[in-house]
Amino acid sequence: MADSLKMGSLSLNESQHAPAPNSSGRAAYIPPHLRQRQTGANMDGAPAAAPPAPGPSGPGNSWGSRGGPRGGNWANANAPDFSPRGPNPNGNTSWTPTEGSRRSFNPDAYGNPGHGGSYGGGSARGSGDGQWRDGKHIPGPANARVERELFGLPNDPTKQNTGINFANYDDIPVEASGQNVPEPVNAFTNPPLDDHLIANITLAHYQTPTPVQKYSIPIVMNGRDLMACAQTGSGKTGGFLFPILSQAFQNGPSPTPAPASGQFSYGRQRKAYPTSLILAPTRELVSQIFDEARKFAYRSWVRPCVVYGGADIGSQLRQIERGCDLLVATPGRLVDLIERGRISLVNIKYLILDEADRMLDMGFEPQIRRIVEGEDMPHVNDRQTLMFSATFPRDIQMLARDFLKDYVFLSVGRVGSTSENITQKVEYVEDHDKRSVLLDILHTHGTSGLTLIFVETKRMADSLSDFLLNQRFPATAIHGDRTQRERERALEMFRSGRCPILVATAVAARGLDIPNVTHVINYDLPTDIDDYVHRIGRTGRAGNTGIATAFFNRGNRGVVRDLIDLLKEAHQEVPSFLESIAREGSGYGGRGGRGGRGRGANATRDMRRVGGGMGGPPSFGGSSYGGPSAGYGGSYGGGAPSYGGSGGGSYGYGGSGGGGGYGNPSGPTGPSSWW
C-alpha cells in the first residue's frame, strides 16, 4: 500500500506546491495573490522564479525574508504601503532599507484628520474625495456608485423632490429683522454659492431655494449670525448646509494647531479639529443631517462625520480619525468625546443648533452651555452661530442672547402653525374603538404611500405594530427601547417602502425627513399642540400634499382650543364635536390664553423688539399653571422659576421636586432613554 502511494519517497522538502513542476507534469501551484507577479509562474506552466535566499531567521521564517512580501508569503505584495513612514527619497515605498539608509518618520503621512494630507501635500483622501492644494479646491473624480447611493436614480421613490405645490412657497410671508439684513437670493447661482456646491445641488434635483434658504444663504455668506424659524419641511437643513459648505469650498481648511510642548504624535493623530459643528437632539436627526452633508460635500475636501449615543463609540472614533471637517453630533456624545480628548473645538468657525427648542425640552441645556461656553470653542465674536427650529419660545430667544451676536431674526410663514398642503381630519374615537377605526382607515387609503402612526407609549408602539402584522398589514415600530441597529433597520424598511406602515413614539416626531409619507395618523393625540404640529409635519413636505388624521376623545380636551385655532389657521374644517367640547368650558382654562410652548403671541417675533428688549413679562405664563411667574420661569412648574425652581414641572429644567419629563438628567429616571 505504501509502495503504491510512494509514501516512502516523500520528504518535507518536496511538494506539489514547490515552484518546480512535479513528477506528473502539472504546473506548480501559485497562490491567487501572486499569480500576476512577474516573478511568479506563467499561466502556461512555466516554472516560477526561485524564492529568495533564506534570511538569518531560518528557511521557514517568512518574517525574516526581507526579499519576499512583508507579512509572510500570504501577504499581498501589491498592497499599498500603510506605513506611517514618509517616502524614501529614491521613491522606494517598501519597508526594506535601501543602500543602508533608513527613512525618517513622518507623523503626517498617515491618518492626519481634518485634511487627510490635503492641507499640506494635497493628496486625495479616498475614492471620490477632493483635495485642497496650493490654495485651490480641486474636486475629486465622479463615482457612479456613490452618486447612485447619495442622490438616487431619476424618479427614485426613496428620494423626495419638490412637490406639486412647491411654487406656493413664494406666497409664504417672511419677516427678517435686524440691522442691515442682506437681500434674499432667488436661485442657486454663483455668487454667492460655490460652483461645486451648485453642481451637487443639481445632482440632488433641487431647482429653486425655499423661502428660508433664500434668506439664510445671503445672511450666512455675509458673516451674520442667524436665528431662523420656519415650518417643518421647509428646507432648514439646506438653509445652513449650503452657505457653510460653500464657504468651506472657497476658503479651504484651517491649519491644525501645533501640539503643546512635551506632546508627541505617533503616526495617527488622535484628536480631530472640525471647523463646523451641528448639534441636534436625536440620533435619527443627526443621522439625517449627516446624510445630507455627505450629499452636498460629494467630491469635495470636506469630510462630514456623525456621532451619537447608543451606538458603538469605537467605530465613531475610527471614523473621526480618518478625517473630520464637519461634525454632526448629539450633545451628550459630543461631551463624552471632548472628555476623552478626541475632539477639539478650537477651530470651529460655524456652530449650528438645530431643533434648539427640543434640545432644551429634553434637558440638554447644561451640555449645550458646557460645549459652547465651557470648552475651547472660539468666542461668540470669533465664530458664526446659527439657530434653526420650527418654534422659538421665549426661553430659546433668551438663550440666543448668550450664543449669538448682532443676529438676524428670520421668521418664515406662520411659525408654529401647519402647512396648508396637509389635509387635516379629526375623528371622534373612544379608546376601545381605535383599533377597528384604524383598520377601516388603512383599508380605505391602502398602502400606496407611506403611513406614519404616532402613539404615546413604547408598549403601545409594539402592541399596535404586532396587531397590524396579525391583520396582514406590513408594519414595524420605532421607539426608545429599540437598539440603534433595530431603529435604523426599521427606518430603512419604511423609507424603502418594504414596510409602508411605521408605528412610532415621539422619538420620530421632530426633524425627520422621510420622503413620500402620504398619511400621518395620531392614534394618541399629544398633550402639547406643538408636538401635534411636528407630528403631522412629517407629511406635506417640500410642497407635496398629505393627509393627517387624529383620533380625538374627551381625554384630549386639554388641547381642544389650540386644535380648533390650528385648524382655522390652516383653513381646515372644524368638526362640530370640537366646538361642542370647547363650549363646555373644560378646554378654555388649560393654556392660559393660548400660551403653550412656542405658541404664545410672541413665539414667532423677535424678542429684541418685544417687552423692552427681552425684559418684559413672559408671553406664556399666566395663572392657568400656578399663578404669575417671575422673569421667564414658572410656566410649567407652578410659580417657581423653571430653571432650577423647587416646583419642577413636567417640562422643568431641574428643581428638587421634579425633573424633566423628557429625559432631564436631574429627573428620577436619570438620562433619557431616547438618545
UniProtKB/Swiss-Prot annotation:
Gene Ontology MF terms in the entry: ATP binding; ATP hydrolysis activity; eukaryotic initiation factor 4G binding; G-quadruplex DNA binding; G-quadruplex RNA binding; mRNA binding; RNA helicase activity; RNA strand annealing activity
Enzyme Commission (EC) number: 3.6.4.13
Spell out the residue ranges making up region: Disordered: 1-141, 583-605, 647-675
Return the Low complexity bias intervals: 665-675
Q: Kindly give the Pfam families that the UniProt entry links to this protein.
A: DEAD (PF00270), Helicase_C (PF00271)
Motif segment (DEAD box): 354-357
**Motif Q motif: which residue numbers?**
186-214
Q: Which GO terms describe its biological process?
A: cytoplasmic translational initiation; negative regulation of cytoplasmic translational initiation in response to stress; positive regulation of formation of translation preinitiation complex; regulatory ncRNA-mediated gene silencing; spliceosomal complex disassembly
Q: Which residues bind ATP?
A: A230, Q231, T232, G233, S234, G235, K236, T237
- Keywords assigned by UniProt? ATP-binding, Cytoplasm, Helicase, Hydrolase, Initiation factor, Nucleotide-binding, Protein biosynthesis, RNA-binding
The similarity comment for this entry is:
Belongs to the DEAD box helicase family. DDX3/DED1 subfamily.
Descriptive protein name: ATP-dependent RNA helicase ded1
